[in-house]
Amino acid sequence: DIVIETIGGVGVAKDFVMMALKEGKTVVTANKEMISKCSHELERIAKRNSCGLYYEASCVGGVPIIRTLLDGVQANHITEMMGIVNGTTNYILTKMAQDGADYQTALKEAQALGYAEFDPTNDVEGFDSTYKLSILASMAFHTKVPYTKVHREGITSVSATDIAIGKEFGYVLKLLAIGKNGEKGVEVRVHPTFIPAAHPLANV
């Protein structure tokens, strides 16, 4: 049997998933918050009961990044990762850049179009990106990277002026999830970042 968890959050969802795994049922979930906070505990239960815990959809939706990290690049030593992992904030920042709109105007349009939740905190304050980075960095760097270790800054303080000044100098502002694994250990952060207009991520 396969159980698909769509509850969201950690409390009830985690209890439900634990119960299913203990019954030997494979679980599929897109719950990035639960996975970032509880994956090791849940994976131990799954292994003990000879069932699976699959969460490909928890990070970057249609891109099979988790499967790639697990199976496709195991022979590689990854030292750095960087990407745009939240569509809501990317839409808002792109709208601000293209139309010269302020943050609130761009947010309201995103909400009207269904790109942003009624309460957008999880996205615009960087929590969503933080959970995803915690999951991806843990896999890429082969060590548990707690979400609490991720330095987090959202986009709520970004102004149209910030974006316009960056544009004058040939830069684009994006909310990036950045992970580095060096001699001093793992560094993980989510924050608005100016990148050159010629950078591959600038046109995302």
Task: Tell me what each language-model feature is.
Residues 2-5:
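N-terminal Rossmann-like NAD(P) cofactor-binding module of classical short-chain dehydrogenase/reductase
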Residues 7-23, 30-72:
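Rossmann-fold NAD(P)-binding glycine/threonine-rich loop
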Residues 10, 35-36, 100, 127, ...:
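Short alpha-helix boundary/capping motifs
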Residues 23-26, 87:
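Glycine-enriched alpha-helix->loop->beta-strand junction motifs that scaffold or abut catalytic
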Residues 47-128, 135:
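Rossmann-like NAD(P)H-binding beta-loop-alpha module
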Residues 105-203:
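Substrate-binding/catalytic subdomain of NAD(P)-dependent oxidoreductase enzymes
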